[in-house]
Amino acid sequence: MTKHPALKGIRVLDVSSVLSGPLAAMLLADLGAEVIKVEPPNIPDFTRGTGDARNGMTAYFYNTNRGKRAISVNGRQPEGQRILQQLADQADVLIQNMRPGKASGIGLDPSQCLQRNPALIYASINGYGTVGPMSEEPVYDYVIQAVTGIVDVQRDRASGTADLSHHFPADKITSHALVEAILAALFARERHPDGRGQEVEVSMHEANLAYMWPDAMMQHSIVGDVDGPGIYPGEYYRVYSTIDGAVVVMPLMGPMAGICEAINRPELAKDPRFQALDASNLDEFQDLLAEQISKWTTEETLSAFSEHDVPVGPVIPRNEIHDHPQAKARGSVPEHDVFPVGRIRSARPAWRMKETPELLHQGAPTMGEHTDVVLAELGYLPEEIAALRHVGTVA
């Protein structure tokens, strides 16, 4: 194993807020990048005040800002803009998720940043992109869910009622798309003869269209006539109630013998009604499946299907997922004692590289925790920092 993580030495300036940008920056920190998070004085990141908290630190903020240093700078003041520009001049990556053009208001216009620091990867998240009739519209996760098909695909087939996905998938999908783009841009910079950086843009709209397209849009990709009516399996899969909980069983589109034997109905595998499962018979077959599962406990259901090598899983409440035996065996949800919040759980990075370690940082910064240290690194004297704090430029 090498002695340092993949992005050791890469400096990231994070002037984003809430979820999409901060999560992307944290993922880079997990890969070893040095990340500085910027918040305006007296305007903490929204996530600092949302959800469960202890001693002033919320789990939401911790889950999106581990491993960063935090400074508090007023980018609306000229001297604050000068500080941000100095940080951008020293950065390898800048991440912002403001509406198009708004970053100029804090002195971080992309063209000017790249003119001063040609090696910079200037990474922007926006709602609909920088061109088009909706490019300046305000956007949040649930709006993007609505316009990219995520809400529609949640629609109940029986009632026709559409529904949201009750977390923020559109933001998180965009975060991961931005990290992909940033890593590619850093690699491209290494190959460029002059080591030049570039602007990188990810719109929430396009990131989530790309996310939906491979499977959820399989019936809406071919333009014009198709060979015959197809089926989108995702519309038919169910959650099955047990005596004491619920399970999910898959697949239903492949060989059925194992499923039929698991529910003690082997004859169904040869039943003419179910020789090919499609829109005409899937509901009927699943009704039979549901009838048997409803007579079993969750443990009995898992045992019956596992015995016949049928993929099955229990519906686990969120407050119990850290106790899943696989999560415990792999250390997927480690616990740490972290100031000021105390004992806290977090999901480890999704990747495992045999020769390059990831960093699961154990701390998230308090508001402006590293302002003085970072300004000192820029060359500011203690009395200059005190003067800036006195006029509200920093905190």
Residue ranges and their predicted role:
Residues 235-308, 312:
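Aromatic-enriched alpha-helical interface/lid elements that frame and gate functional surfaces
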Residues 42, 128-129, 204-209, 244-246, ...:
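Glycine-rich beta-alpha junction loops
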Residues 1-11, 241, 320-395:
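Terminal low-complexity tails and localization/encapsulation signals of metabolic enzymes
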Residues 130, 159-169, 190-208, 226-232, ...:
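Conserved Rossmann-fold dehydrogenase catalytic segment
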Residues 35, 306-320, 381-386:
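Short, well-structured beta-strand/strand-turn elements
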Residues 209-228:
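Active-site-adjacent elements of ketosynthase-type condensing enzymes
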Residues 1-192, 288, 366, 372-395:
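N-terminal helix-loop segment corresponding to the beta1-alpha1 unit
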Residues 175-198, 214-220, 260-267:
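Oxidoreductase and adenylate-handling cofactor-binding alpha/beta cores
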